[in-house]
Amino acid sequence: MSSDKFKLDTLFDDNDEIIEPDGADVKKRNVAYYYHKDVGHFHYGQLHPMKPQRLVVCNDLVVSYEMPKYMTVVESPKLDAADISVFHTEDYVNFLQTVTPKLGLTMPDDVLRQFNIGEDCPIFAGLWDYCTLYAGGSVEGARRLNHKMNDIVINWPGGLHHAKKSEASGFCYVNDIVLGILELLKYHKRVLYIDIDIHHGDGVQEAFNNSDRVMTVSFHRFGQYFPGSGSIMDKGVGPGKYFAINVPLMAAIRDEPYLKLFESVISGVEENFNPEAIVLQCGSDSLCEDRLGQFALSFNAHARAVKYVKSLGKPLMVLGGGGYTLRNVARCWALETGVILGLRMDDEIPGTSLYSHYFTPRLLRPNLVPKMNDANSAAYLASIEKETLACLRMIRGAPSVQMQNIVGIRLDEIEQIEENERLQKSSKSSIEYEVGKVSEKMEEECFVEEDSKPPSFPPGQDPRRIGQYWGYDRSGLAPPRSHSDVIEEAKYEDRDRRKDLNIPGIP
């Protein structure tokens, strides 16, 4: 990576603007930011590491830094069953649409197994609404890019990359990324998908594994680690051979080697694939100190990867993904919103934030301290880079334009998007500053990330089915099917305290 593009000790450059005080005349960027005040108020269950409340805190930081005035803020629409069935099977969509926690208690085990419902992917109240909200921003965001209404769209609630065509996986139920890419393919011949989540983007690769119109590139922790896929030799099949790029990394990779490899691979992809649009999944579990992650990336490095992709100048959709240390998820995505907008952000979190007292230190980019040695040798990374670039050189000619199962173009898309925005503007509340606030009970649970009190369950209820339990299980280690299959890899800081809770699977 050339030293003139990114310096490891700084993130912002001379082209980035200082955020103007409230009331100042500012220039809006051609960026759309999707958010809905309800999307962060769902609850996977007590002890479950996935906290949608992180979205509320992230949006609070975005508002506190006064970023909405620099972009178009759009209320995420809810998708309907037909929208989601563009990718997912009818049986699975019907299940998601009708299942409730109470109904789940009476369902046969084979039905739950069919859709991979369990500890990782529980049934919780409002499951269908949650899915339609987080996916709505990705699908409509793709439509805005298709019609050149924006250069960049941001949907932090999206990026749930593990969901499969007919089953849930890895905390993900509906694959909003696949739905968004299918929309983009209506107007773009070639779409590039980049994934910097610590977990392999298996659901997206699987969906496009035999396509030469979508290239998937995943930088992920490899080995005995969920989902257990993403070998460097996994390169796609049929027409899609060499269009799946996997960059398997070992634990505790540091900033400089990660960024060097990232730029080398992505520049090679840009040269050989020449995408017309890009989707970037920004899972923040690749940060150092993540509760489930094992990388050692700083906030600067993670954001620098986003900045590099933005610099390619292609229509860009930016999505969230994993991330299980709530404060750092909010910090990361708020920071990257500013990077996308080209803003120079004060490192001190504004006192106007509703959650500023939970950030200790009260900094946007605190120093994260690695607890493991980097397991990625220079020789190993060089071999990964060499093999990846060789794979890219195997691409012959331009990808085909035709692709099976692409739905027809809707002629009324622009009118519908504009109508949605008109209705939003005429409503009494302003989405730009309607932050939302989680309940005090939920707030305490989310920020006190290791619950010191044992969960209480009503007699006779199976907590694994209703989202009140999340633990570990030593079964099924080859290959891992869920996060709970990889007990040695999914670490919590206070293991002994969880052991005292008598959670099954904790020795």
UniProtKB/Swiss-Prot annotation:
Residues 29-342 are annotated as: Histone deacetylase. Residues 444-507 are annotated as: Disordered. It catalyses: N(6)-acetyl-L-lysyl-[histone] + H2O = L-lysyl-[histone] + acetate. One of its GO terms (molecular function) is transcription corepressor activity. Its EC number is 3.5.1.98. One of its GO terms (biological process) is chromatin organization. The active site is at residue 162. Gene3D superfamilies: Histone deacetylase domain. Transmembrane segments: none annotated. It holds the Pfam family Hist_deacetyl. The keyword Magnesium does not apply. It is found in: Nucleus. GO terms for cellular component: histone deacetylase complex; NuRD complex. The keyword Transcription applies. Residues 482-501 have a biased composition (Basic and acidic residues). Keywords: Chromatin regulator, Hydrolase, Nucleus, Repressor, Transcription, Transcription regulation. It is an enzyme of class 3 (hydrolase). InterPro entries: HDAC_PDAC, His_deacetylse, His_deacetylse_1, His_deacetylse_dom, His_deacetylse_dom_sf, Ureohydrolase_dom_sf. Probably responsible for the deacetylation of lysine residues on the N-terminal part of the core histones (H2A, H2B, H3 and H4). Histone deacetylation gives a tag for epigenetic repression and plays an important role in transcriptional regulation, cell cycle progression and developmental events. Histone deacetylases act via the formation of large multiprotein complexes. As a likely component of a histone deacetylase complex, together with saeg-1 and hda-2, functions downstream of the cAMP-dependent kinase egl-4 to regulate the expression of genes required for egg-laying and forgaging. May be a component of a histone deacetylase complex containing saeg-2, saeg-1 and hda-2. Belongs to the histone deacetylase family. HD type 1 subfamily. This is Putative histone deacetylase 2. It comes from Caenorhabditis elegans.
